[in-house]
C-alpha cells in the first residue's frame, strides 16, 4: 500500500478523532445534566416523604367515613398508562426497555389500554406495536418542572374522574444509581387504602376539600419525582453509551495509527532497499 493508502488511513483517523470529540463532549454534558437532575430529585423526594404520610392518614379516615373515588376507583374496564420516554436519542436501550415494560403490562389487553406518551422517541416504538396514544407531551425540560408534572397529572386525573379509565399507571425507568436503572410500572390511582396508617383523624372544615387539595399536591409531586427519576436514568444511560463510544473510538484510533505507522515504515524500508540496490548496481 503506497501513498494513496496512507492518505486514506489519515482521513479515517481524522474522521474518528472528530467523532470522538463529539461523543466525549456529549458524555460530559450528560454527566453535568445528571448531577443537576439528581440534586433536584433528592429535594423533591424530601417533599414526597413529608406529604405521603398525610395522604395515607387521609386514606384511612376516608375509608372509615365512606367511599371516595380516589380510593374506590370506578367501573371502567380501561386502564391508563403514562409512558415516559426521551425526546433525544443516543441513550442506549433506555426507550426500548420502557416500551418493553409497557408491552409486558398490557399483553393481550391492548383494547382496554389507553396510552399517554411523554417524550417523542417513544412514538416510533408505539407505532410498531400499533398503539395510538390518546395524549402526547414532548419537550420536557432536562429538569422537569412542577407545571409540566401538573399538565400530565391534570390529563390523567380528568380521564380518571370522568370514568374513562379505572386506573392510572406510570411506566418509566427508575433511577437507582449511575450504574443501575430499573424499568417499572407504578399505579398512582386509585390509591390503596392499605397504605393508610391505623387510627382516624378529625378533618375540618370538610374531608373532601382537604382530601382533594392534599391529593393534588401529593400526586403532582409524585409525578414530578417520576419525571425526574426518568430523566436521571436517561442521562445516566446516555453517559454510559457515550463513554462506551469514546472508548471504542480510542481503540479504533490505536489500530488505525498502528496500521498507518506499519505502512509508512514499510514504505521507508522499501525506499532504502531501492536506494541500496541502485548503489550496488552502479558498483
UniProtKB/Swiss-Prot annotation:
UniProt cross-references to InterPro entries, sorted A to Z: ATP_synth_F1_ATPase_gsu, ATP_synth_F1_gsu, ATP_synth_F1_gsu_CS
Location(s) in or outside the cell:
Cell membrane
What keywords appear on the UniProt entry? ATP synthesis, Cell membrane, CF(1), Hydrogen ion transport, Ion transport, Membrane, Transport
Membrane topology recorded in Swiss-Prot or TrEMBL:
Peripheral membrane protein
Pfam families named among the record's database cross-references: ATP-synt
What broad class describes the main subcellular location of this protein? membrane
Q: State a GO cellular component annotated for this protein.
A: proton-transporting ATP synthase complex
One BP term from GO: proton motive force-driven plasma membrane ATP synthesis
Question: Which PROSITE patterns does this entry report, sorted A to Z?
Answer: ATPASE_GAMMA
- Indicate whether Ion transport appears among the record's keywords: yes
| Keyword Phosphoprotein among UniProt keywords | no
Family in the record? Belongs to the ATPase gamma chain family.
General function of this protein: Produces ATP from ADP in the presence of a proton gradient across the membrane. The gamma chain is believed to be important in regulating ATPase activity and the flow of protons through the CF(0) complex.
Report what the protein is called: ATP synthase gamma chain
Which species does this protein come from? Clostridium beijerinckii (strain ATCC 51743 / NCIMB 8052)
Q: What is the lineage of its organism?
A: Bacteria, Bacillati, Bacillota, Clostridia, Eubacteriales
